[in-house]
Design a protein with these regions (language model features):
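An active-site-proximal "capping" alpha-helix that borders the catalytic cofactor pocket
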Residues: 60, 262, 473-490
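Extended, compositionally biased alpha-helical segments that mediate assembly or anchoring
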Residues: 571-673
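Catalytic Zn2+-binding segment of zinc metalloproteases
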Residues: 449-461, 487, 491
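Contiguous, non-catalytic segments that form substrate-binding/exosite surfaces or channel walls
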Residues: 116-117, 123-225, 229-430, 436
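Post-HEXXH active-site segment of zinc metalloproteases
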Residues: 455-478
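C-terminal motif of bacterial Sec signal peptides marking the signal peptidase cleavage site
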Residues: 15-18
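Long, well-structured alpha-helical subdomains associated
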Residues: 81, 485-589
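Bacterial signal peptide processing site
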Residues: 20-22
Length: 673
């Protein structure tokens, strides 16, 4: 499970929550410079940033090799994510990139500029659907203009892959709306287009689920296909679906295993390799157990088919890779959270029968990202808690990480204009300026370390993807948010040395959460649209529920001033109680598998938008030029060789342009044809 930055760096105050051929021209900027240019460029609704890798130059040569091999393994699977997102993505990308590189005509007119913008949006989203809203991207040029470009560059793109750029077909990558066939209405490539919601449920009702009490993540690494009327799975593995890319992943993982920091780490990599070779989900669980217990060493990684947000049914994992270097100082400061995990569980407002009696193995680290790929790039999370399998988490624990250098990049690229526009008063602004960054880090930490690790299912109740279905993801993210919100106003945080004033810290966190959940996140959707993305939905249902339940006591007051709308919290302690009540209810829903209650909560509070308020927010936001979404180019790791072909050093080079990195990736890591 991951906590994403779902807004631009300017909105971060609202929540926190090789030697290569054909490489692009690069700057001489390195990760050790004191002056660093965080912003690459901006287009459409996207801002592209850079991040540094603190601590990389202090690693030993074997540690640098380990990072480099894992970096290569991650990028080797990049195109898997593109194909998972939509069946025509790779063909469309290849055609658009060929035009981009070879067109020699007029590049100053509006049509070409619109083409460039569209291609950059496709790159950013790993396909033709928006990375966040899941809506199909709308090109700012005509079919006739694209045909002209294709002809002038001798590029082939015809039939459905051409038509789908412009027509209404496959308009949603993921559609979790109530009342529609969520599978048939979703363009994501986890299921053949002819497969329906009921067919998926029927197939997985009888599929292998693992040993009793230790269920595997059924369907995680497969595509469901229909051949001659019969439904079956194609497995992602060597020799199977995506085999050519997976073989490259395996090649680099084998090299990484050879320079592992310790025996446990090496054994863990061996299990990951075995999983990629076989596609066996029991092996995946063995790997996850070994990985969660691999806590020594400075280097760690996430690699595999992991998060299920892109599957309307919650079975299929999207490919991702994140390479991490431990931030020792920050990890030491935040270790007290994992050390006190049982205290948080025992004192939480959950029903006693839903509390874990023995919270095991919760580890928390702040890390610096060295590289990302797949579902984690260019749009990246800021916090991750894994593994996702509930029984493994309960018996073996979990790892929670905060991506420190990613958060720092957002903070260093930011400004305060939107805060001053949407905050209710100067006190709110002052709290944000004083405690905003700390509140961000602590909400991320509490969400990941305590939130996702808390609570337990009732005996005999199925996994949330089976019981809560299309509401499982937003319910889990909201539940983890509520854990964080409840404890952010607790004196325990001050006792643990995490803040100098828990009350002001809590007020800051509550202000920013309500401000974002009820107001500022609306800048990310079009007027008239419902909220659909799981994290946005969860922030609205949490905020709307506590607003409504506290209305009679004016816990939160809606303020209209000079034609603008604000929300002012009058009673922070009562608000904390409401967060606690809602937390107890969301845990009950999860523990009991209460689909109807989840549906009522999400549909009743999280989806529909006040259209008058939405129009107002969009108008107020229009004066700001910064984009509502941000993502990153990755630093490029360059292996320096001696005459014998051995790696003697690995250096960091920052890419000059977003387009340059995307073209380079396609040329060097295009293993799916």
């Amino acid at each position: 499970m991951k906590l994403r930055v779902l807004f631009s760096y300017l909105l971060i105050g609202a929540l926190i929550w090789s030697c290569k051929e054909n490489a692009p021209e690069k700057s001489a900027t390195s990760s050790v410079e004191t002056s660093f240019d965080y912003v690459v460029e901006q287009f459409a609704d996207i801002q592209i940033l850079r991040y540094q890798i603190p601590g990389f130059n202090e690693l030993s040569i074997d540690q640098k090799k380990l990072v480099y091999y894992l970096y290569q393994a991650g990028l080797a699977g990049r195109d898997i994510m593109w194909d998972q997102n939509y069946r025509h993505n790779l063909q469309i990308r290849a055609a658009l990139e060929n035009v981009y590189e070879n067109f020699s005509g007029d590049k100053e007119n509006e049509n070409w500029k619109a083409f460039e913008t569209y291609l950059k949006r496709v790159w950013f989203s790993n396909g033709i659907h928006h990375h966040y809203s899941n809506d199909k991207l709308v090109p700012g040029f005509s079919p006739e203009y694209l045909t002209e470009l294709l002809n002038e560059t001798n590029t082939e793109l015809s039939g459905e892959p051409f038509d789908v750029i412009f027509n209404e077909q496959d308009s949603k990558k993921v559609n979790k709306k109530k009342g529609v066939d969520n599978v048939a209405a979703s363009a994501v490539n986890f299921y053949d287009p002819s497969i329906t919601d009921k067919e998926v449920e029927a197939f997985y009702a009888t599929a292998y689920k693992g040993p009793e009490g230790k269920p595997v993540e059924t369907g995680l690494n497969t595509k469901l296909v229909k051949r001659n009327g019969k439904i079956s799975e194609e497995i992602y593995k060597s020799g199977g679906l995506y085999g050519s890319a997976i073989d490259e992943i395996i090649k680099w993982l084998e090299l990484a295993k050879g320079v592992a920091e310790n025996e446990q780490q090496g054994n863990t990599l061996a299990l990951l390799i075995e999983y990629y070779k076989t596609g066996n989900l029991d092996t995946w669980d063995e790997y996850a157990i070994s990985w969660v217990n691999s806590k020594e060493g400075d280097i760690d990684w996430i690699n595999g088919f992991i998060e299920v947000y892109n599957d309307p049914k919650g079975y299929k994992g999207s490919y991702e890779s994140i390479i991490q270097i431990k931030d020792f100082e920050m990890s030491k400061q935040m270790a007290v959270l994992s050390e006190n995990a049982q205290w948080f569980e025992d004192t939480s407002p959950l029903m006693e029968e839903h509390k874990k009696k023995n919270v095991v193995g919760v580890s928390y680290k702040t890390v610096n990202v060295a590289a990302e790929a797949g579902d984690a790039s260019p749009s990246t999370p800021i916090g991750v808690n894994l593994p996702n399998n509930n029984w493994i988490r309960q018996e073996h624990g979990s790892k929670s990480v905060s991506l420190g250098n990613i958060i720092d990049s957002y903070n260093n690229a930011g400004g305060s204009g939107r805060l001053k526009e949407f905050a209710n008063d100067t006190e709110e602004i002052a709290f944000e300026e004083k405690y905003g960054k700390t509140a961000s880090k602590l909400l991320t930490a509490l969400h990941e370390v305590v939130g996702h690790a808390s609570g337990q299912l009732n005996e005999g109740v199925g996994q949330p993807k089976e019981t809560l279905k299309n509401y499982a993801s937003t319910m889990e993210e909201g539940r983890a948010d509520l854990v964080g919100l409840y404890f952010l106003m607790d004196p325990k945080l001050q006792e643990l040395g995490l803040t100098d004033n828990y009350e002001e810290l809590g007020k800051t966190a509550y202000d920013r959460y309500i401000r974002n959940g009820l107001v500022t996140q609306l800048v990310r959707i079009n007027l008239g649209d419902d909220i659909e993305e799981d994290h946005m939905v969860n922030r609205q249902w949490v905020s709307s529920w506590v607003f409504e339940k506290g209305m009679s006591d004016k816990v939160i007051e809606k303020v209209e001033r000079d034609g603008n709308t604000y929300y002012n919290i009058n009673d922070y302690k009562k608000l904390r109680e409401l967060f606690g009540e809602l937390l107890q209810e969301t845990q009950r829903i999860k523990s009991e598998g209460d689909f109807k209650a989840a549906q009522d909560l999400v549909e009743g509070y999280g989806v529909k938008v006040d259209q008058k308020l939405h129009a107002e927010v969009l108008e107020r936001n229009s004066v700001f030029k910064s984009a509502p979404y941000s993502g990153f180019v990755n630093p490029e790791l360059v292996a320096e060789m001696n005459d014998a072909g051995e790696i003697v050093n690995v250096s960091i080079v920052q890419p000059e342009t977003f387009a340059g990195q995307m073209i380079s990736y396609s040329k060097n890591y295009g293993f799916l044809k």
